[in-house]
């Protein structure tokens, strides 16, 4: 496994693989890796001959400077994890490599509509930062496939829309949310939880699961289910940002006869902001 830090170096590596007709996969990360990230790497290895994992803490997707500053940087530990998974290259660029014109002069890539609701409404500019850095990474590496997790469901839809709208020759693959045994979705931000908060954190998964099961049983008054979900979280000591039921394909508000839905929630528990979702697939509604 090689650690490459410059655009020229990683492009040179990719050019060599392409000359040998090898397929390249990219797994974009911000580091502080956990089992969820490693599952992405495993899937990427199934889809390509060479896997590149990028590690770059992207300031453009943080709307809170303190959040950016305290985001865990664990590069040495991340390297050890990835070395065991057959990764070909870890791409760890500097801020100047990714944004050579400095942050105040960056050319942004933004998906309108989808980027402004739910998570986008709570974290202004967040998705613009995500799509900008992903577009830059795609342009640098030009992978045939990139792998993302379904835990960040809205992000996944936005990246797929960006790729489709800009005719990027990249396949966007996803894997199901990786969870601990108690249901808590794995996240780098789980490290912010105290021991007591960690014990309560799976209540978020429970609230989503309850809503999903109730929908499967035929309940269609979604506003009541959303309020019930928020109240479950408040009662457990969470501070919810949102708890919504949306159409799975575009996150629009459902009309009541859709077959594919998703329940999405975000809530603070102490200093940790947890997000999760639960997809709901229904039989055809007569």
From Swiss-Prot:
GO cellular component, one term: cytosol
Presence of keyword Membrane: no
GO term, biological process aspect, one: pantothenate biosynthetic process
Originating species: Nitrosococcus oceani (strain ATCC 19707 / BCRC 17464 / JCM 30415 / NCIMB 11848 / C-107)
Family of this protein: Belongs to the pantothenate synthetase family.
List of residues binding ATP: 30-37, 149-152, 178, 186-189
Residues holding (R)-pantoate: 61, 155
UniProt: beta-alanine binding residues: 61
Key words, A-Z: ATP-binding, Cytoplasm, Ligase, Nucleotide-binding, Pantothenate biosynthesis
Quaternary organization: Homodimer.
Name of the protein in question: Pantothenate synthetase
Annotated active site: 37
Class of enzymatic activity (EC top level): ligase
């Amino acid at each position: 496994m090689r650690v490459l830090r410059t655009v020229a170096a990683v492009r040179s590596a990719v050019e060599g693989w392409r000359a040998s007709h090898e397929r390249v996969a990219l797994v974009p990360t911000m580091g502080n890796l956990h089992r969820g990230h490693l599952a992405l790497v495993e899937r990427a290895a199934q889809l390509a001959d060479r896997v590149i994992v990028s590690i770059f803490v992207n300031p453009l997707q943080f709307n809170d400077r303190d959040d950016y500053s305290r985001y865990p940087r664990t590069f040495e530990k991340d390297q050890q994890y990835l070395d065991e998974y057959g990764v070909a290259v870890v791409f760890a660029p500097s801020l100047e490599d990714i944004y050579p014109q400095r942050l105040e002069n960056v050319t942004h890539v933004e998906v309108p509509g989808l980027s402004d609701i739910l998570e986008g409404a709570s974290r202004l500019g967040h998705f613009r930062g995500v799509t900008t850095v992903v577009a830059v990474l795609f342009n640098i590496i030009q992978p045939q496939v990139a792998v993302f997790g379904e835990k960040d469901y809205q992000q996944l839809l936005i990246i797929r829309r960006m790729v489709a709208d800009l005719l990027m020759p990249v396949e966007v693959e996803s894997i199901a949310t990786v969870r601990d045994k108690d249901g808590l979705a794995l996240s780098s931000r789980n490290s912010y939880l105290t021991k007591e908060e960690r014990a309560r954190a799976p209540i978020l998964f429970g609230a989503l699961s309850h809503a999903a099961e109730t929908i499967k049983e035929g309940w269609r008054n979604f506003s009541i289910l959303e309020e019930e979900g928020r109240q479950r979280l408040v009662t457990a000591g969470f501070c919810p940002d949102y708890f919504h039921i949306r159409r799975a394909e575009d996150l629009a508000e459902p009309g009541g006869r859709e077959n594919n839905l998703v329940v999405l929630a975000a809530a603070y528990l102490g200093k940790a902001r947890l997000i999760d979702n639960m997809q709901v697939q229904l039989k055809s509604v007569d």
